[in-house]
């Protein structure tokens, strides 16, 4: 969703549905892109996080395989036209599952290769998770575009403040 109001749900109520969709999708993506690392990211990957109730997946590939992975994913999923599209990031969506799905195709080591690190920081830092949840609660029912801008600022600040958070090792 790129417009309208932000609506959040209790992640514990949708955890089983998200897990089932992720496992099914992980198998499909692994068959399609056997050299990719496939990670459950986003709020539903973080116990206690406030979420919109969707599933976010990060597909990490080497830069040399990015264009081919992008082509293969574009044959099977809709492009998320509201998201950035660069030489190292492509976004896709799938509304046909039990929960909405967003897929971020990311080149390892590229400028957008921070999704797994952000997930791990949220899992490891109660303080960062609480700040993230507070931001989300503040934006509940308000502009989605403005929320995305503020969320990006918070993520950038938190990652800069925690430079020793382990990078993705896949």
Give short role names for the model-derived ranges.
Residues 5, 80, 157:
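Structure-specific DNA junction-binding interface
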Residues 80-134:
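Conserved, surface-exposed functional patches that form binding/active-site neighborhoods
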Residues 1-39, 170:
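Helical scaffold of the NTase/Pol beta-like nucleotidyltransferase catalytic core
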Residues 111-170:
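Catalytic cores of NTP-dependent nucleotidyl/adenyl transfer enzymes across multiple folds
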Residues 8-26, 61-97:
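Metal-dependent nucleotidyltransferase catalytic core
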Residues 32, 72-76, 121:
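Conserved short hydrophobic interaction patches
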Residues 26-68:
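Active-site nucleotide-donor binding segment shared across nucleotidyl transfer reactions
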């Amino acid at each position: 969703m790129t417009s309208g109001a932000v609506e959040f749900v209790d992640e514990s109520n949708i955890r089983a549905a998200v897990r089932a969709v992720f496992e099914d999708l992980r198998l499909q993506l692994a068959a399609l892109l056997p050299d990719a690392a496939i990670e459950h990211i986003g709020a539903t990957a973080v116990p206690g996080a406030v979420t919109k109730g969707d599933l976010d997946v990060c597909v990490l590939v080497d830069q040399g395989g990015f264009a081919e992975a992008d082509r293969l994913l574009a044959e099977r999923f809709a492009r998320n036209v509201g998201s950035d599209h660069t030489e190292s990031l492509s976004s896709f969506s799938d509304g046909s599952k039990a929960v909405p799905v967003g897929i971020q195709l990311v080149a390892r080591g590229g400028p957008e290769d921070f999704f797994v690190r952000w997930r791990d920081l949220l899992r490891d830092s109660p303080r960062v998770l609480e700040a993230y949840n507070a931001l989300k609660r503040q934006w509940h029912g308000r502009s989605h575009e403005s929320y995305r801008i503020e969320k990006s600022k918070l993520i950038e600040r938190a990652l800069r403040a925690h430079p020793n958070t382990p990078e993705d090792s896949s």
